[in-house]
């Protein structure tokens, strides 16, 4: 599939947070794993609450330059290991670290709805600004696709009567 964006992954899974839903559906990470394909094809999970991606923000006291230097050093170590063992998963790890670094600029821009026109927000319903709702996740899916993500899977619990089937 590839990716058209430098700052966002090619495959994203967005999970919802359903208040009051006790449907028993659990979204295990292996649902969007790469299976028999190399791990570089697995999905990146965007959470339904809080920061969409854990650890995208720099911790207190960590500057962008310091983080870049740390990432460069980790990359050097990983490349040395790759030269020794030729394991393609090491290349994937290097690419994942780089993507995580670039997502620090891509994700905040993605989730900033201040420039989204009100008439567009209205199309998604009254809960569109509530993080973790189906409306919000559909809006995020559209914004991801507009920014070059090739495949977005929206996982929403309780939509099909699993909670009241009797």
Describe each PLM feature range.
Residues 1-166:
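Ligand-binding pockets and gating/stacking loops
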